A protein has these predicted regions:
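Donor-sugar nucleotide-binding helix/loop cap in glycosyltransferases
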Residues: 2-249
Length: 249
């Protein structure tokens, strides 16, 4: 019997732009880390950027298991938490750093579900979490993208399509589908394609047994020229889906 040819989803170069953002090193323990760091930040008064940074780094070092953490990893934690979750606001011109309302909310309410809802509601592209060199491409491509909002819209549109076919199934999304059909398609992230069109594409791809990750696809190549793994390709969409689960969305 002849081997069945694998059919891959093909997104033309002109529509491809890989969405990426800061990924915390502590993601496997994110709930405990965020609750701890929110509390520690709220104990630091408004002070100079240097003083706040010292107190903040010391708080990271005192988190259980971090006492012998390498300096580079400590610095990664230091930049990742404010970049992604905005736990403090640094004004270098005035030389003052203040703990943010997001950190205060989490510390006072101890409500991770609501915290992640607030986070996802405001997390967008372009956004303050991005590096300047990445912002240039996002703006040039006219990308205006709120990941969680778009995912919810696609799920709702998918439910309508399934219901119209008398299906009792509910729409779902895998990290691969979210990566290739939503995150990395400029037509979606710039609002040129409706959520209903995205949902239809995904459902059609399932029906036609279309695969997504293809190590031979030039889009999978890293800067070194090696192919990224499936996990590398889908990690950002996977993160947002995980955060949505924590937000009970």
């Amino acid at each position: 019997m002849a081997k069945q040819e694998i059919k891959y989803y093909n997104l033309p170069d002109k529509y491809w732009h890989r969405i990426h953002f800061v990924r915390p090193r502590f993601k496997s323990n994110i709930e405990n880390v965020l609750l701890y760091m929110a509390g520690e930040c709220c104990r630091i008064p408004d002070c100079s950027c240097e003083d706040y940074n010292k107190k903040y780094l010391n708080a990271i070092r005192m988190f259980p298991g971090n006492i012998d953490m390498a300096e580079k990893t400590l610095q990664n934690w230091r930049t990742e938490i404010p970049a992604l979750f905005g736990f403090y606001v640094e004004d270098k011109e005035a030389d003052i750093t203040r703990t943010s309302k997001m950190a205060t909310f989490l510390y006072e309410n101890q409500d991770l579900t609501q915290f992640f809802r607030l986070f996802l509601m405001s997390f967008q592209f372009p956004g303050g979490h991005m590096k300047p060199q990445d912002l240039k491409d996002i703006i040039y491509l006219n990308i205006r993208f709120k990941p969680a909002k778009t995912i919810i819209q696609v799920l709702l549109a998918g439910n309508e399509l399934l219901s119209s076919k008398n299906s009792v199934k509910e729409m779902s999304l895998s990290a691969e589908e979210t990566t290739y059909c939503i995150f990395n398609d400029v037509r979606v992230t710039s609002g040129q394609i409706s959520p209903k069109q995205v949902a239809k594409t995904i459902l059609d791809n399932r029906k036609n047994q279309i695969k997504y990750y293809n190590p031979a696809d030039p889009h999978t190549k890293s800067l070194t020229g090696a192919s990224r793994t499936k996990g590398d390709m889908t990690r950002y969409a996977g993160d947002i889906l995980d955060y949505m689960e924590l937000a009970d969305l």
